[in-house]
Amino acid sequence: MLLAIDCGNTNTLFAIHDGNDWVAQWRSGTDSTRTADEHAVWLSQLMGLQGRSFADITACVISTVVPQALFNLRNLSRRYFKAEPVIVGEPGVRMDIEVRLDRPQDAGADRLVNALGARAVYDGALIIIDSGTATTFDVIAADGAFEGGIIAPGINLSMQALHGAAAKLPRVAIAKPARVMGKDTVSAMQSGVFWGYIDLIDGLVQRLKSEYAQPMTVVATGGVVSLFDGASKAIDHYDADLTIRGLLEVWKLNGGADT
């Protein structure tokens, strides 16, 4: 079985693929100081609840936007799975995607992995929205090349900034308000962040489509993207497994077959 690890700024996703489908997924808060042994204790307990063990894992693929976390994740794979991990972005790791940026090295590992995951399922030109610590909009050409995109603050980051910078504004949960106009501080903050982000998404997608001047499919993924379901007019597909599907594609491109 393949263990795919997607290490983001806020959360790290561990997912197991049995050769046919994803059979387990777990999230933990990203902590670059967590040792390989600490990862192993946590992961072994969760796998044990499903009747699985480390002996089931024969391969590992890792993508991280937190360089400090890589050392311990690599050691987790080496020490406990006896597998040399495929690590996105390292020399010699194939991605098979043309990057049409002025500085191709600026393309983040997570964004390229998302592009591969989307290309495996969707045809034609694409806009991929990934809502995490940052909200990214990535344009994938009809020929599969990474054209560029937009990086905006994430919805959680915006809510935290309101609370942190304004002394009288409380910490509130992100939620879809029943109405746009708030009747108290909490609902006003929720409305500003939620509907502000919906208009950010819909407005930027419209601008990208106008600039690109051809039909495009819009795919959304990320930890909070389910909140937008039914609210955004621009999103065509919500795809929770987009990133780990991309990691599976990376594994296949680099010799992976029987997981």
Swiss-Prot record:
GO CC aspect terms: cytoplasm
Q: Where does substrate bind?
A: G108, A109, D110, R111, T185
- Cofactor: bound how, per the entry note? A monovalent cation. Ammonium or potassium.
Domain of life, per UniProt, equals Bacteria
Q: In which pathway does it act?
A: Cofactor biosynthesis; coenzyme A biosynthesis; CoA from (R)-pantothenate: step 1/5
Q: Per the UniProt record, which EC number(s) apply here?
A: 2.7.1.33
Q: Which GO terms describe its biological process?
A: coenzyme A biosynthetic process
User: Where does this one sit in the cell?
Assistant: Cytoplasm
Which reaction does this enzyme catalyse, per its entry?
(R)-pantothenate + ATP = (R)-4'-phosphopantothenate + ADP + H(+)
Cofactor(s) needed, names only, are: NH4(+); K(+)
Which residues are catalytic? D110
Principal place of residence: cytoplasm
- For the ligand (ATP), the binding residues are D6, C7, G8, N9, T10, N11, T12, L13, T133
State how it assembles. Answer: Homodimer.
Function (record text): Catalyzes the phosphorylation of pantothenate (Pan), the first step in CoA biosynthesis.
Q: What is this protein called?
A: Type III pantothenate kinase
Q: Which organism is it from?
A: Maricaulis maris (strain MCS10) (Caulobacter maris)
Species lineage, top-down?
Bacteria, Pseudomonadati, Pseudomonadota, Alphaproteobacteria, Maricaulales
